[in-house]
């Protein structure tokens, strides 16, 4: 009785693990897709300025060297200027 209950529980665990793995494969076409999406999202955080330097957007640390983009204010990190 204990052996069959263990086999049923083990079967359910394997079934859940397999379905989870299929969901993950559907979400990302390749293993590198997650890294690629992370870099594509962060790539837009830096915008070139006229002087060839880059300005910082929201949640990037800022100081006298690393200026915030237009419309953002520096308060340890760049925050959107609400007005």
Swiss-Prot record:
GO molecular function: ion channel regulator activity; toxin activity
Signal peptide extent: 1-21
UniProt keyword list: Disulfide bond, Ion channel impairing toxin, Knottin, Secreted, Signal, Toxin
Superkingdom of origin: Eukaryota
Propeptide intervals in chain numbering: 22-53
Tissue expr: Expressed by the venom gland.
S-S bridge residues: 55-69, 62-74, 68-78
Compartment(s): Secreted
A GO cellular component annotation in the UniProt record: extracellular region
Domain free text: The presence of a 'disulfide through disulfide knot' structurally defines this protein as a knottin.
Family: Belongs to the neurotoxin 30 (phrixotoxin) family.
Function: Probable ion channel inhibitor.
Protein name: Kappa-theraphotoxin-Cg2b
Originating organism: Chilobrachys guangxiensis
């Amino acid at each position: 009785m204990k052996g069959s209950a263990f086999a049923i529980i083990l079967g359910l665990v394997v079934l859940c693990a397999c379905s989870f793995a299929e969901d993950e494969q559907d979400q990302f076409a390749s293993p590198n897709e997650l890294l690629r999406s992370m870099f594509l999202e962060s790539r837009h955080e830096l915008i070139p300025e006229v002087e060839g330097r880059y300005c910082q957007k929201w949640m990037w640390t800022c100081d006298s060297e690393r200026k915030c983009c237009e419309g953002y204010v520096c308060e340890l990190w760049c925050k959107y200027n609400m007005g």
